[in-house]
Every structure is written in C-alpha cells, then in structure tokens.
Regions:
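Conserved phosphate/ATP/ADP-binding segment of small-molecule kinases
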Residues: 164-174, 180-253
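Conserved phosphate-binding/catalytic region of the ribokinase-like
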Residues: 1-8, 26-27, 216-333
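Glycine-rich phosphate/adenosyl-contacting loop at the front of the ribokinase-like
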Residues: 1-74, 86-87, 333
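A short, aliphatic-rich alpha-helical micro-motif
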Residues: 2, 141-142, 195-196
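Active-site metal-binding loops of divalent metal-dependent hydrolases
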Residues: 12-13, 152, 272
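Conserved phosphate-binding/catalytic loop of the ribokinase/pfkB sugar-kinase fold
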Residues: 100-104, 113-158
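A glycine-rich helix N-cap at a beta->alpha junction
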Residues: 91-108
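Structural alpha-helical scaffold elements that stabilize or flank donor/cofactor-binding regions
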Residues: 7, 139-140, 191-194
C-alpha cells in the first residue's frame, strides 16, 4: 500500500524575477502609511543584476520546505501551457514533490512576479492569472494528514468553499492556514469556515492586526480574537523581535536564531518559518520544538537569494539546533 501523503500544499505558484537595485539609485521614505521605496521617475536607472527563480510562491515554498524536511508532499496548483509552467513543474519534481495534481491551463500564461531587491529588503510586484480553480478528486492514498493553504488569486473565492467542503468530509485532515494578500482582504466572515477549521494559522504582526481587528500593541488581544475565529494554534511573527505562539493553554515567545552573517535578502523568511513550524508538528514535535525549528530555517533562507535556496534538510536543521546558544528557547509571556 502506498505511503499516505503527509502534506498537501494549496496555492498559486509563480516565477520570481529579482532585480537587484543599486543602493544609491533608490532610497526609503516613511510616513504614517508605511515605508516607501523611492526612485527617480521618468528616466533610465542602472541596476546591479537580475535573477530568475522558478516555482516559488507561499504554497510552493511550503511544499519545498516540507519535502526537504522529509515529509511526503504533493501540491494542488495551476500553471499555464508555456515554458515557464513546464519549468515550474520540473522544479517541483526535482524537489521530490508529487505534481500529479498540478493543472496545466490551455492558452493561459504562468504567474510571474517581479521583485525589487533593495539592500536586504524587497518589494514584490504581484499579478495572479485568472485560472479556473476547482478542487480535484483525491484517491484514498492522495488524502493527506495535513493541508497547507496559502496565497491564491482574488478570483478564487468559490474555490475556498470547495476546499472547506472537502475538509468537512475529511475531519481527520489538519489544516494549516497562512493567508495571502487576497485571502486576508476577503475578510474573516467570508472565509470563516477556513479560519474555524484551522489547526494552525501563521501571520506576521501587521497581518494579525488586520485579520483580528485587534490592537497591534496588544498581542494577547490579537491572540484572543484569532482563537475566537476557531484557530487552535496561532503564531504571530514579529521581525527582529522573534515570534509568539498560543495554543489556547500557553503562550510562548521565541527569539530569532542568530544570523551567522548579514542577511542577503529576506524573501521567503516568513514562508520558511510558517512551513517549518507546520512540518515540525506534522513530524510529531511539540509546540516548543516547532518554535525552535522554525527560526533556524528562516535564518538559513535569508543567507541566500530567494525563498528556497536556503531551505534545510532535517539533518542540517538539527545540526544548527545543536549549535544554538543557551538562550535560544521558548519562554512564557
């Protein structure tokens, strides 16, 4: 009998084109609406170099992360019938991810995003193609222990209902929800079935404020509101301040793993954290153990370009954990 799938990722897959900006050709300003990347308008600007990375995106990054950590992984996604789509499928297969549920859309192009890379930060220009989303029929051996649902096009709202219907019919399947931009904008009322079904939800602090409607400075308030939606385990990442997690019984703070060198760029740090946290739970780790694993993969990812090059195997991750300083542990808050 075939081994059961451990994790099934759901979401859009993209090709990222990184454009490394020259430091003195742009600058960052800040106002009450946030930080802004500023460049001279209406002229030609030199750039350092460009890199193209295939088969990325929140859900794809999670699938690669889970597969490298030893989980049997599959992926439900859409690509166009172009060379980029074929290249992305091959990239997934190279990572030992089952691509039998990847749908190739005739006469459609594949998703392409452009990443403006300035110093160690990035601004991503996104555009999701309008595919016809529908939930596939899964054979018994394709039914996973975990579903990892993340960023998807804004025209896929009804698809969320199909996923929710399927989850209702398979109550033993655990859901990890890392909502993307359009999913958060859809609101908690529209996607209430997914929030209520979530075994794990991972958000950064800004996203947690938006989704919960709580006060950004009050973590406990945001946790209370997110648990009230039905989410069992909630994780809020907070940049240089580390991450916080709540399972309804305990609330823990986890520091960042120290960087061995200055970060190269930060694309995929959040995806690495979220997916590694979920993979750790799927492999039987405790909440504290999952919190120890996740920052290590984030640390490794930011040492490379893009969201996947730095993703670790379980052996590599455990080697970093063995070298962790004494203070690298979860504490109550």
């Amino acid at each position: 009998m075939a081994r059961q799938t451990d994790l099934l990722a759901i979401g859009d897959i993209v090709t990222d084109a990184f454009i490394k900006l020259i430091d003195d050709q742009a600058y960052v300003t800040e106002n009450d609406q946030g930080k802004w990347l500023t460049m001279q308008f209406g002229t030609k600007l030199p750039f350092d170099h460009a890199e193209v990375l295939e088969g990325v995106g929140n859900a794809s990054n999670a699938a690669v992360s889970a597969s490298r950590l030893g989980l049997k992984t599959s992926f439900v996604t859409n690509v166009g019938d172009d060379k980029e789509g074929l290249s992305m499928i091959r990239a997934l297969q190279k990572e030992k991810i089952d691509t039998s549920l990847v749908r190739v859309n005739a006469r459609k192009v594949s998703n392409m995003h452009y990443v403006l890379w300035y110093k160690e930060e990035r601004t991503i220009l996104i555009n999701h193609e309008n595919y016809k989303y529908y939930w596939p029929h899964l054979r018994p051996d394709e039914i996973p222990r975990w579903v990892y649902f993340s960023s998807i096009s804004e025209n896929a709202l009804e698809y969320h209902d199909q996923v929710s219907d399927w989850l209702d019919k398979h109550p033993d399947v655990k859901l990890a929800f890392q909502p993307g931009t359009f999913q958060m904008k859809a609101g908690t009322e529209r996607l209430k079935r997914l929030y209520a079904r979530s075994e794990v939800m991972v958000l950064n602090r800004e996203e947690a404020e938006f989704v919960s409607g709580g006060k950004r400075e009050d973590l406990h308030d945001m946790f209370d509101r997110l648990h009230a939606l039905g989410c069992k385990i909630v994780v809020i990442t907070d940049g240089p301040d580390g991450a916080y997690a709540s399972d309804g019984n305990q609330r823990l703070k986890m520091p960042l793993y120290p960087d061995p060198a200055p970060p190269k760029e930060r694309t995929g740090a959040g995806d690495a954290f979220a997916s590694t946290f979920v993979a750790a739970l799927a492999k039987g780790n405790s909440l504290e153990g999952a919190l120890q694993w996740a920052p290590i993969n984030s640390m490794s990812v930011v040492q490379q370009t893009g969201a996947q090059a730095g993703l670790l195997t379980e052996k590599e991750l455990e080697e970093w954990l063995a070298k962790a300083p004494e203070w690298y542990k979860a504490t109550q808050f």
